Amino acid sequence: MAESPTNSIVREDQTATLVELLRTRATKQADDLAYTFLIDGKKEGVSVTYSQLDGLARAIAAFLQKSQVKGERALLLYPQGVEVVAAFCGCLYAGVIAIPVPPPESGRMKRTLPRLRSIVKDARASIVLTTERILETIANVQDQFPEFETMEWIDTDKIDYQLGEKWQDPQIDKEAIAYLQYTSGSTSTPKGVMLTHGNLVFHCGNLKKACGYEDNSVTVTWMPYFHDYGLVEGLMVPLYNGTPCYIMSPFAFVKRPLRWLQSISKYRATHSQAPNFAYDLSVRKIKPKQLETFDLSCWEAAGNAAEPINPKVMEKFNETFAPAGFRWNTFAPAYGLAEATLLVSTKPKLTEPVIGYFDSQALERDKIVAVSKDGEGVRAIASCGQLVCETQVAIVNPDTKERCAPDQVGEIWVSDPSVTQGYWERPDATEESFNAYITGTNEGPFLRTGDLGFLQEGELYINGRIKDLIIIHGTNHYPQDIEWTVQQLHPELRPDYGAAFSILVKGEEKLVVVQEIERRAKDIDPEAMLPEIKQAIAEEHELQVHALVLAKPGNILKTSSGKIQRRACKASFLAGELGVIADWSENPQITAKFRDLEGEVESLAASLKNNK
């Protein structure tokens, strides 16, 4: 392994672009380890120093510069690894706008290609940087997508490394767009967030301070490069900080979750991040004897973000892995979004996480009433920490756009230099989301996050998405709470694979719950589970279920970061497209009736369009 990094001699705060930063690292820390890929999350594969990464980036950039494509958009289609980091940096070195996207999966083309195609259309991308294997996968379906045939497909493994000698500085500044981060689309069609070099450099500096990165920090990451959490904190912050990063594939993590923790132990990682489900999965997969095989006492910041944080999962993980050296204060719950580059808030390193306890009925009325932990009707919410550096947050009524009282839940509005320019070629959406002002004041502009939450004693709490909120009889219900209630009833109900949403029935909102059953479930009676689930929801949430579906695995869609796509699940339910194992409804013909209703609406829309 390379010697200890000498990153203290690099002034990151004096660099305007990622190009300047990496060029400086390549000069001052030429032989220091930058990235190592772990094959199957275990065996060391490709490693690069900063000098080698700079050489790869210059070669890729010089190849692109031959075609004079500065300002063009390039898709990055790669498996997780060092290659995609080099391609990302190569785009920046050429002044090409990078677009990290999930690579198509040969066994799931129908599910993965439509989103890729929509991104190509939206960004008007003309270049694809990829590998030979992915080129072969695409070749089988390329004739079905005319957009792909007009693009230049480049296998970066075949680019001559010596070409880097012909690289020319792209002459860009901090205002240049570095990449487009396509939002995960949990509640809407994905949009390309425009992130400048200035956004990225500034925010990496903020994360270095807020998350406690030091000269001896080490990162282990399996978060996908095409997700903002994986790209910014997983891959770019180590580059900014000048410290080593060990990269795992997300597939390796899902297949063998404990290799993530074993890698943290082996490489003495101080920083590693994951969504809530990863901590839950690790608890469910660990066996007592395995705890003896690793030491987690090195871990200083266990980032927890990208999906709702469940305090019970945090407590269970801490209880399970404390014998392996994990500490409660290692947890670092956080909140963020691509539109703010990444994090809005996080818990400072090695401070105690804060769990708030609130009256659940008051929260349903958007009121904040703190209560004791042991009372009845209590909802525990994990704080997402304190605001990052210069970040300012306002809690605002999403309808009136007035600032909420301190004891009210509202929409989270953000102001910070890390807030991005807006959405690629979407001026209306940009105006709506990025240029909000508080009614009756000159306060603004703010970024509207679409998330509900509140501030209490300097801690930011998240309550869910506005568009996911279930409102029945004037009372607010959070889908993640209902889903959690269901999934605790039986081990064969898949954790994190349920969706609660409402549908309109005769002018009234009604509750629908869809829950997947484990693939290897045996000796269960799904029909017998239905009344048990209905009763639990009635007791815990005082809600009557209108329709309940126990579905086969693969019916609950998730975003690239693991968020439940409740609107997609609702659409599948209404279209009668769910793979049903068992179901119940107040109206046995509900699916067919809603299909008919959708057909009527589509016919009416077509009629109105034709009569314009």
Language-model features: where?
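Conserved AMP-binding/adenylate-forming core of the ANL superfamily
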Residues: 34-86, 106-114, 166-171, 192-198
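Gly/Ser/Thr-rich phosphate-binding loop
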Residues: 269-273, 285-377, 392, 400-402
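AMP-dependent adenylate-forming
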Residues: 21-48, 178-180, 187, 336, ...
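Conserved pre-ATP/AMP-binding loop-to-beta segment of ANL
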Residues: 30-33, 153-154, 161-182, 188-189, ...
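AMP-binding/adenylate-forming catalytic core of the ANL superfamily
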Residues: 262-265, 272, 416, 421-422, ...
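AMP-binding/adenylate-forming catalytic domain of the ANL superfamily
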Residues: 15, 496-497, 503-504, 509, ...
